[in-house]
């Protein structure tokens, strides 16, 4: 019995020292050495005592038999109350039977030891009463979630009472012997332990918690008190566990006293471990109900899991002496010494491995596999690596040639940003550096030595109840199943296996388990009763009972196998790896590894990796601790000190292992608000991208998306990311995707308005400019697609059509659609972006059609043309009159008038601002309750650009008006030219000399085209003084239009005096009066009227030309001499205000005098400004020498139009008679010089022809050549002839049996009438049918337009203009020849180079005339070839028929191609939709089968459902494919009936005229 005492006392001391050592890992090496020396001393005492026990082993045979009998009796009682748990496997039974003999020997020794014990062995002893009470209240404590902790004093008293009862049964001699030997040493050790504890408290600054005592009891009355089994458990990696169970003659309760100490957070391998007594209480509080529903076989499996996690043989676990230490419960025989030593080593190794498991994944290892001293610290050795492999840590791909790192040993690749985290993870190649005694067994994991691992009590199991249920069958592999622990057959430990039965007598166990950190399960851990070992071979009665239990177990296993077969292995989550106590079989490891590679999107060579290496990778993947996976951990970390590693860990959790309960807890703890606050306010750039990634993963979960939808600040915060320079392009693209999801009203109610408001309040002038720049600047088509998806969803989600049009117009003004049309031609290979562009165009076309319908309805309802200002004003006036708002309308109009009168820029800005304000008010539907609803701050943004646009449009309008005026003048000149050509033709046809009237008529028309030359002298017949005429250089008369014509007659005499009225007044000074009719045209004279005494107001009438007066009504009027008007009264009533002008003239300084016509003088001044520093006389020299280097063609043309008239020359003559020439303006002086230049007009004409002949020929020749070539191309085109044949057959078939059928030919214009014949359903026409035939039967005809390249130019040529130009060139050359002849006859000097020029020009004109005639002949042949009338058809009309036919043909080809592409896209969409529906059905079927399989196996709310995988990705895929738009296409489309049903109210409210948007639910 002394042996027992000597082995028990050190056990308690060892447990105390191990408890201290668990916390003293933070102390200096000095404290550790003192503790180690104390443990060595205890170990020596235990070894000596074991030797004495072996000698007395044979004496104690008789008590062993009694103990065995009592055990059988107890087992029978247990079988009567409750069904025993079936024995596990036959292999275990054989192992246990072999151990029974050894266990019996050990039990005998322990019984002797207890009899001689006289004093408490440990500081915590539990007597029978406390054990009984604790056992009775165990279930109540589990329900109340409280674990009772007896006070230390009460425990000591109970232990003392228990020891006193044991003294009566044991031998006094053994008790006294043990007492005397150990008492002294115990007191010394206690003092050392107290000192160490005090020092630990001082260093750690926290009190050592009271030990947790867990006692399991049964409701049945206990048998007589046996000697207790005391187990002291500690979590220190250097402490030992000593257990001394004793078998008494009667089976007695064996309480398990377990001590657990609060741990302190410590970084080991990058992992933070922290488990306190409160954590264990929380874990064990809510498991009572879970354990109730667990079947017996599952409870058996739970016990197996606990046993596999515990040490097979508790013993000394000090790594410093594990090679020599012995187990206290070892046999006294010498034959078992070696086995005990091995057990000691195994226990030590097992403890170390369990400690390492706290940093890994709570994976248990066999105790004989690893030599603790041979385990070094072995981490990754990363080298720079170039490649595109995925990161093992975060799962993201790297860009080509970007920096990544690869482990030299295991080949794992990680990003630079994940390098710090990966350096804390042990390398998988550590398997090659681990040295164990048993190499045949597989080493399942590795962790660095000296890692702090805190152990939990043995009754705590990390496996979920549902997980345990699925793990009892051995035939079906499961991630959650734990195979039975492999213990040494020679290991004599009493707690290897037992039956956990709540109705059985008290069951105890001294097991050691390691705290696990489960990723998948955050629910409270289950509590299971640890088993005890059978200490004697079973009796025949017991064997019969065990067989019955085995049969029941087999039936239950079969039921479980059927349930597990219904569940798919693929749905097993990799996070349940932490629930596995030992390494599963190879097939399960391969399945887990393949699933992990798929989740991480990696392509590691699985065939090259061994099963052990795969298992190590799985361990590294799920290395996180349980407390690091809790939402509270991340919330506290984000609040206190956020870092890049925290965000990366959170992203991993959210991406792979998040559950509904986890997400609910995260949301309830305001985790979403914290993320947005960090994203908004933090100035750190290193983790902002990771923070945005966390938000994206949160939104991928329905619970997280709902939480984000309730945050008003979310859209604004994400919008800031777009314009911030702190984020990369990838993060901005993610922000665009998140905003796209927020726009979907179905998932984020009201999100569209929040996003739009956030974009409006940005500092940019144009709120959507970022998205347009994002599309234009980025070359990636994927990024373009994301931005365009946002734009389409934004426009689509707007219910009001006016708002949609307004938003779309903003994008159009930014140039979005122009860019989209350009890239649409080059991105046909990118179907997604092409689809988004088509959706943008479809929505735009639909809104345009709907707007047109509304406008038409509005016109019909109002009965006015809304484009007419007068009609709109009348309707508005009538509406305001009925409403009594006339005064307000008048005030608005008056204010508009004031704006225009006060502002010098005609109030452009104000009118634009008013237009914008009224437009926004008309679109506003919210009422006037809240004035803040009106947003006027952004109105001034586009005011400057709009003003510039209006100003530019005004200038463009003026220029267009000028161009129209010039075009009209040119047209009038063309008419005059044609008239002259007709006259010339008449003269040629007649062959006789024309009479004088005809010559005068021609001269008059020439004068109208060009200013006439000035006369030699002009007299004023009405001048009373009859002054001498102005003498200038003699100007010969103009050359005759034809040879042989007489010179023109002199000017007509002055008008006749007389008549009833007074004589006409003299002309004003310096003027010749009103212009008289030209000399060449005779018409009746104007009526005689008296001269007013002062200027009168002008009468704005239009003067008829003399040619038009003849043969008109005015030519047949009477003499009109009898009309005597009240001349004086008219002068008084219509007098002009000339007095004011006289006063201004007096004040005004006197400038140069201008005599000629003001308009002519202004034009001459502008022309002379081009020749700065050149005198007017020098210009005459340029004309005389025909120097083209001095004067250009345009300048010569201008100077030909600026010749002074005869009236101007006469006025200048009169002025020079009275005043000096220096007083005249420069324009007047120029007119004097040019008038004195002989033959000025003729020489200018010669110069003009020489300068512009080449350009005129170059303009006409290509047009003639284009028509000529086009005739040849059409005539020789075989494909065109084939097309005409096919159409002839098609037409006869269509018109068969009608008068239009059965024909042999048709007119060419029938080609363009093919599109007029529509199909029955109006979806196609005859040209489409023809194109389809060509595509299928004769595809070579599709390129017939390539044979007609000149057709485009020929159809644009105006043939009549070409003919006129050729004739004009010929006349001009002939006219210049006549001028040269006249100058030669008059001996007038001129430039002789003109003679050579005329010779060359005549040759060119002759060639041009021949080319024209040849082309006309070819065209006549072509018309005859196609059965067209020669005289009626012009070339431009003929070729235009073919051009229009080509356009129709190409349009039909494009339309058919688009229809084909649309059909293919629609088929692809339907196929994708069908595939998604099939996947949804499969998911639903799988979930239903899983739910209907068994109520115990139904999917809990804590499991990760398939529907919650990634909702954001699914929504974006629907948007990209276009399904989101097409499915809801009819949701908001307002019909024509709705628009017409809205009647116009009296106040013309636009909200009542136009359909209102439906309210969103």
Swiss-Prot record:
Organism: Dictyostelium discoideum (Social amoeba)
Claim: Zinc is one of the keywords in the record: yes
Start and end residues of each GBD/FH3 domain: 581-929
Phorbol-ester/DAG-type ZnF: 379-427
SMART domains according to UniProt: C1, Drf_FH3, Drf_GBD, FH2
Protein role: Formins play an important role in the nucleation of actin and the formation of linear actin filaments.
Domain spans labelled DAD: 1488-1518
Segments of skewed composition (Acidic residues): 80-89
Comp. bias regions, Pro residues: 220-229, 1034-1070
Ranges of Basic and acidic residues composition bias in the record: 29-51, 162-187, 1466-1481
Gene: forE
Composition bias, Low complexity: 1-28, 230-258, 326-365, 465-534, 1017-1033, 1071-1081
Keywords assigned by UniProt, alphabetized: Actin-binding, Coiled coil, Metal-binding, Zinc, Zinc-finger
Protein name stated in the entry: Formin-E
Disulfide bonds: none
Pfam families documented for this protein: Drf_FH3, Drf_GBD, FH2
Gene Ontology terms: biological process: 'de novo' actin filament nucleation; actin filament polymerization; cortical actin cytoskeleton organization; mitotic cytokinesis; sorocarp development
GO MF annotation: an example: zinc ion binding
FH1 domain ranges (all copies): 1019-1081
Record's GO cellular component terms: actin cytoskeleton; cell cortex; cell trailing edge; filopodium tip
């Amino acid at each position: 019995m002394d042996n027992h005492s000597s082995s028990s006392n050190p056990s308690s001391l060892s447990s105390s020292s191990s408890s201290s050592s668990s916390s003293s890992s933070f102390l200096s090496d000095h404290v550790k050495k003192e503790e180690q020396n104390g443990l060595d001393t205890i170990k020596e005492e235990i070894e000596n005592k074991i030797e004495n026990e072996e000698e007395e082993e044979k004496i104690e045979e008789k008590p062993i038999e009694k103990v065995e009998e009592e055990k059988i009796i107890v087992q029978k009682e247990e079988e009567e109350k409750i069904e025993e748990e079936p024995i596990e496997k036959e292999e275990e039974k054989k192992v246990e039977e072999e151990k029974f003999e050894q266990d019996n020997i050990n039990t005998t020794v322990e019984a002797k030891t207890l009899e001689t014990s006289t004093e408490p062995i440990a500081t915590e002893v539990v007597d029978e009463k406390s054990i009984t009470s604790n056992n009775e209240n165990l279930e109540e404590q589990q329900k109340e979630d409280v674990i009772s902790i007896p006070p230390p004093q009460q425990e000591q008293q109970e232990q003392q009472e228990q020891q006193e009862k044991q003294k009566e049964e044991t031998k006094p001699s053994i008790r006294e012997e043990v007492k005397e030997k150990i008492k002294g040493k115990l007191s010394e050790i206690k003092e050392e332990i107290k000192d160490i504890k005090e020092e630990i408290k001082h260093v750690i600054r926290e009190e050592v918690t009271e030990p947790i005592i867990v006692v399991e009891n049964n409701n049945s009355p206990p048998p007589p008190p046996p000697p207790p089994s005391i187990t002291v458990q500690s979590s220190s990696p250097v402490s030992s566990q000593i257990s001394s169970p004793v078998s008494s003659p009667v089976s007695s309760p064996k309480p398990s006293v377990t001590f657990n100490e609060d741990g302190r957070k410590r970084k080991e391998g990058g992992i933070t471990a922290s488990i306190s007594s409160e954590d264990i209480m929380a874990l064990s509080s809510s498991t009572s109900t879970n354990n109730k529903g667990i079947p017996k076989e599952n409870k058996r499996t739970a016990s197996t899991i606990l046993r596999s996690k515990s040490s097979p043989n508790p013993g000394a676990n000090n790594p410093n002496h594990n090679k020599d230490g012995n187990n206290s419960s070892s046999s006294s025989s010498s034959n078992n010494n070696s086995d005990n030593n091995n057990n000691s080593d195994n226990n030590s190794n097992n403890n170390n491995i369990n400690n390492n498991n706290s940093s890994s994944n709570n994976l248990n290892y066999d105790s004989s596999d690893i030599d603790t001293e041979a385990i070094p610290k072995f981490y990754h050795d990363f080298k720079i690596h170039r490649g595109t492999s995925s990161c093992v840590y975060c799962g993201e791909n790297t860009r080509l040639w970007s920096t990544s790192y690869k482990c030299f040993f295991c080949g794992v690749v990680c990003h630079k940003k994940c390098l710090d985290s990966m350096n804390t993870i042990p390398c998988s190649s550590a398997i090659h550096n681990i040295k164990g005694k048993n190499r045949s067994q597989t080493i399942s994991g590795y962790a660095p030595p000296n890692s702090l691992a805190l152990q939990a009590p043995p009754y705590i199991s990390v496996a979920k109840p549902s997980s345990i249920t699925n793990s009892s069958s051995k035939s079906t592999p499961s991630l959650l199943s734990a195979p039975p622990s492999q213990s040494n057959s020679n290991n004599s430990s009493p707690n290897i296996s037992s039956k956990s039965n709540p109705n059985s007598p008290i069951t105890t166990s001294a097991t050691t388990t390691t705290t696990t950190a489960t990723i998948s399960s955050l629910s409270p851990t289950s509590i299971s009763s640890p088993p005890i070992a059978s200490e004697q071979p079973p009796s025949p009665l017991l064997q019969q009972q065990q067989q019955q239990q085995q049969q029941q177990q087999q039936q239950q296993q079969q039921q479980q196998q059927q349930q597990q077969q219904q569940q798919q292995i693929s749905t097993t989550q990799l996070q349940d790896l932490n629930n596995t106590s030992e390494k599963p079989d190879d097939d399960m490891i391969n399945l887990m590894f393949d699933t992990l590679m798929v989740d991480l999107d990696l392509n590691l060579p699985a065939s090259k990796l061994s099963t052990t290496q795969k298992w190590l990778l799985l361990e590294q993947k799920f290395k996180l601790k349980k407390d690091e996976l809790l939402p509270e951990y991340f919330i506290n970390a984000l609040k206190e000190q956020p870092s890049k590693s925290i965000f990366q860990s959170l992203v991993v959790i959210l991406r792979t292992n998040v559950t509904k309960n986890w997400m609910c807890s995260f949301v309830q703890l305001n985790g979403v608000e914290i993320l947005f606050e960090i994203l908004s306010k933090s100035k750190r750039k290193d983790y902002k991208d990771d923070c945005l990634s966390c938000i994206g993963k949160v939104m991928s979960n329905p619970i997280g998306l709902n939480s984000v939808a309730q945050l008003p600040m979310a859209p604004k915060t994400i919008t800031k990311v777009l314009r911030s320079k702190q984020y990369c392009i990838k993060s901005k693209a993610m922000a665009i995707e998140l905003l796209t999801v927020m726009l979907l009203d179905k998932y984020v109610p009201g999100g569209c308005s929040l996003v739009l408001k956030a974009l409006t309040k940005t500092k940019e002038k144009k709120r959507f400019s970022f998205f347009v720049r994002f599309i234009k600047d980025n070359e990636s088509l994927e990024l373009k697609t994301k931005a365009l998806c946002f734009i389409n969803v934004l426009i689509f989600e707007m219910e009001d059509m006016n708002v949609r049009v307004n938003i779309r117009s903003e994008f159009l003004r930014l140039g979005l659609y122009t860019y989209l049309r350009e890239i649409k031609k080059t991105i046909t290979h990118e179907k997604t972006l092409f689809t988004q562009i088509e959706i943008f165009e479809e929505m735009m076309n639909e809104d345009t059609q709907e707007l047109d319908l509304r406008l038409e309805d509005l016109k019909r309802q109002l009965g006015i043309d809304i484009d007419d200002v007068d009609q709109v004003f009348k309707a508005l006036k009538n509406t305001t009159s009925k409403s009594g708002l006339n005064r307000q309308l008048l005030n608005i109009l008056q204010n508009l008038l004031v704006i225009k009168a006060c502002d010098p820029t005609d109030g452009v800005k104000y009118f634009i601002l008013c237009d914008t304000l009224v437009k926004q008010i008309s679109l506003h539907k919210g009422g006037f309750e809240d004035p803040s609803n009106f947003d006027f701050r952004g109105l001034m943004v586009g005011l400057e650009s709009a003003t510039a646009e209006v100003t530019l449009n005004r200038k463009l309008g003026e220029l267009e008006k000028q161009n129209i005026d010039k075009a009209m003048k040119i047209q009038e000149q063309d008419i005059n030219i044609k008239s002259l050509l007709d006259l010339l033709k008449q003269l040629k046809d007649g062959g006789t000399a024309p009479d004088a009237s005809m010559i005068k008529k021609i001269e008059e028309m020439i004068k109208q085209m060009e200013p006439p030359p000035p006369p030699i002298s002009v007299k004023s017949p009405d001048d009373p003084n009859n002054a001498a005429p102005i003498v200038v250089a003699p100007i010969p008369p103009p050359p005759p239009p034809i040879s042989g014509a007489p010179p023109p007659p002199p000017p007509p005499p002055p008008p006749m005096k007389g008549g009833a009225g007074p004589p006409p007044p003299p002309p004003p000074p310096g003027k010749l009066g009103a212009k008289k009719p030209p000399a060449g045209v005779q018409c009746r004279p104007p009526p005689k009227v008296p001269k007013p005494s002062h200027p009168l107001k002008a009468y704005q009438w239009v003067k008829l030309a003399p040619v038009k007066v003849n043969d008109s009504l005015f030519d047949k009027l009477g003499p009109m001499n009898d009309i005597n008007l009240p001349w004086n009264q008219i002068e008084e009533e219509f007098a002009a205000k000339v007095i004011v002008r006289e006063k201004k003239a007096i004040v005004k300084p006197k400038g140069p005098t201008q005599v000629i016509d003001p308009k002519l003088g202004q034009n001459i001044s502008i022309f002379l400004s081009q020749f700065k520093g050149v005198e007017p006389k020098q210009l005459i020299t340029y004309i005389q020498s025909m120097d083209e280097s001095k004067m250009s063609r345009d300048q010569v043309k201008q100077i030909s139009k600026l010749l002074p008239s005869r009236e101007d020359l006469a006025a200048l003559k009169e002025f020079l008679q009275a005043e000096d020439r220096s007083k005249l303006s420069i324009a007047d002086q120029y007119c004097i010089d040019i008038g004195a230049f002989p033959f000025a007009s003729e020489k200018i004409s010669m110069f003009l022809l020489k300068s512009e002949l080449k350009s005129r020929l170059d303009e006409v020749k290509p047009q003639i050549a284009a028509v000529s070539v086009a005739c040849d191309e059409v005539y020789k085109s075989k494909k065109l002839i084939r097309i005409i044949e096919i159409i002839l057959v098609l037409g006869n078939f269509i018109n068969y049996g009608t008068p239009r059928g059965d024909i042999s030919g048709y007119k060419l214009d029938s080609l363009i009438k093919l599109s007029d014949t529509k199909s029955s359903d109006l979806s196609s026409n005859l040209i489409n049918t023809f194109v389809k035939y060509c595509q299928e039967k004769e595809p070579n005809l599709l390129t017939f337009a390539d044979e007609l390249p000149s057709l485009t130019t020929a159809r644009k040529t105006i043939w009549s203009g070409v003919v006129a130009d050729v004739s004009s060139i010929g006349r001009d050359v002939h006219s210049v020849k006549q001028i040269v002849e006249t100058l030669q006859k008059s001996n007038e000097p001129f430039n002789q180079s003109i003679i050579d020029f005329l010779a060359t020009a005549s040759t060119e004109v002759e060639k041009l005339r021949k080319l024209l005639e040849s082309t006309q002949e070819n065209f006549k042949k072509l018309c005859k070839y196609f059965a067209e009338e020669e005289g009626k058809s012009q070339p431009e009309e003929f070729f235009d028929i073919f051009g229009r036919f080509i356009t129709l043909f190409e349009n039909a080809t494009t339309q058919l191609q688009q229809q084909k592409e649309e059909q293919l896209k629609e088929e692809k969409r339907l196929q994708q939709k069908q595939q998604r529906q099939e996947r949804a059905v499969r998911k639903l079927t799988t979930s239903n089968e899983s739910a209907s399989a068994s109520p115990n196996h139904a999917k809990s709310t804590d499991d990760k459902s398939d529907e919650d995988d990634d909702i954001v990705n699914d929504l974006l895929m629907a948007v990209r494919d276009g399904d989101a738009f097409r499915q809801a296409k009819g949701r908001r489309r307002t019909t024509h009936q709705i628009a017409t049903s809205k009647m116009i109210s009296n106040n013309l409210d636009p909200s009542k005229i136009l359909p209102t948007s439906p309210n969103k639910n």
